[in-house]
C-alpha cells in the first residue's frame, strides 16, 4: 500500500515574509480558502507574536478553515507559544510549530548557547505547546549544517518530549540531493524512537535544489514536505509545492507514495497566489509557467499532434489549466457567464458573486466586444479583491496630455458619503491622476513599484496595473484592471488607499480595545 506524503504549505508564513508589501487579512483568507480547496493537509498561516496583524490573520483563518489543519509558528519562547495557541483557539484542528537553531554556527554566533542548552530549550517549548494541543511540530533550524550526531540527539529528545512531527530544514539551501537524502536516511537508522513521529523536510532553493532535495528526502523516508506555492519565500525561495506534488503524481513508478492534493486546483491556486502577492510567474516555471505546455519546435509540434505523450509527461488538464478559450459577448446572459465560470472550476458564492461579475462583464463586453475565459478570470479576481464596501471609489476621470503639453487630470471620487473633485498636473497622465487623487484624499504615499502587464492577447488585452506604495513605514499592494491603463493605474492607487483607510480603522479599534498582543519584529526562514 502506498504511503501518503503530508503536504505542509507555508505560503502565508515563510512565503509572505519575502513580499514587498504585506498581505491584508482578507487576502490571506482568500489564499487560505484556496489552499483548503486544493487539499493541503496543513497550512502554516502566520507568526502570531510578530505583530497584531499576523495575530489577527491567524485568528481569522482559524475561524474559517475546516478541512485543513491550521498551524502557527512560535520560537522556543513561552510568550510565542501562548500567543500561537490563543490565535489558533477557534480552529477545529490546529498545530503549534516551534523551532530552534541547531547548527554550531547558529548556536555560537546567533544564540550564544551550548548544544545542551538547545536540547533543554526544545524540550521545554514542546512540553509547553502540548498544554494546548497534541499536534506539536519541532524544527531544527539549519539542520543541513548541523553535525549529524547532534542532529540525531535533538531529534530523539524532541520526539521524547512529545513532538508528533520533527522537521529537518535545509534553511540556507546548502545541501545536495544525495547529501540531504543521506541525512534523512541516517536519522532513520540512528534515532531509536523515530517511528513515533513524522519526519518532515523544509528546503530552500538558494542553489536551485529545493525540490530535488525534497524528493530525495521522500525516497529516504520523509513523509511530510513543506513548501510554498510558486516557490515564493526568502532569498531564492522555498521548495515549490506544485513541483513536488506533480513529481509524486507523475513518477509513481519510482516514488511509490501519494498525496491527498486535488491537483486540478493547482493552476488557479498558483495564479491567485501570484496575483495577490504581486509576484509574476516566470514563463519557464515548471508545472505552472506559461510555457510549461507550449511547444515551439516543429519536430516537437509534429510529435505532440501525433501523440501528446511524445513531449508531455503530464497534461494541462491534470493541473486544471483551461485549454478552451470560448468567447462571450454583450448579448450573453447571466446563465452563460455562470456556466462558463463553473466549467473553469469556479463556484458561485465561494469564488465569485454572479451579479457583480455579470455587471463587470457587460461593461467590458461593451468596450471590447468579445470576452474570453482569461477576461472572466481576471474580472472575478478583481471582484474578490473589491467585494468589501470601499471608502474611496472612482466616479469619473479625464486626462489631457500630449507630446508638447503638460498632462492635466480631472478626477472625481466618492469618499464615503460625499463626492470630491480635484484637478492636477503631472509628469504624464498617470502622475497627473495620482496628484489629483492625493489632493482629494489627503493621503500621501510613495510609489515603490509600478508594474503594467497584459491580461489576454492582442489589441483587446486588458491592462493590469500592480503597485506597491509606502505610507508611514508600511507597504500596501494595489491592483487595477481595465482596458485603459490610466484608469487601471487610478484603480490600483485607490485600492491602496482603501487598504490604508481600513488599516486606520483597525488600528483605532485596537487602541479602543487596548489589545494585549505585543508588536515584535520577528522573522524566520527555517
Curated annotation (Swiss-Prot):
User: What keywords does the record list, in alphabetical order?
Assistant: Amino-acid biosynthesis, Branched-chain amino acid biosynthesis, Cytoplasm, Leucine biosynthesis, Manganese, Metal-binding, Transferase
- GO CC, alphabetical: cytosol
Q: Write the lineage as a comma-separated list.
A: Bacteria, Pseudomonadati, Pseudomonadota, Gammaproteobacteria, Enterobacterales
Q: Which SMART domains match?
A: LeuA_dimer
The processes (GO biological process) annotated in the record are: L-leucine biosynthetic process
Know the name of this protein?
2-isopropylmalate synthase
- Keyword Membrane listed? The answer is no
Q: Which reaction does it catalyse?
A: 3-methyl-2-oxobutanoate + acetyl-CoA + H2O = (2S)-2-isopropylmalate + CoA + H(+)
Q: Which InterPro entries match?
A: 2-IPM_HCS-like, 2-isopropylmalate_synth_dimer, AIPM/Hcit_synth_CS, Aldolase_TIM, LeuA/HCS_post-cat, LeuA_allosteric_dom_sf, LeuA_bact_synth, PYR_CT
Family named by the database record: Belongs to the alpha-IPM synthase/homocitrate synthase family. LeuA type 1 subfamily.
Biological role: Catalyzes the condensation of the acetyl group of acetyl-CoA with 3-methyl-2-oxobutanoate (2-ketoisovalerate) to form 3-carboxy-3-hydroxy-4-methylpentanoate (2-isopropylmalate).
**Cofactor(s) recorded in Swiss-Prot or TrEMBL:** Mn(2+)
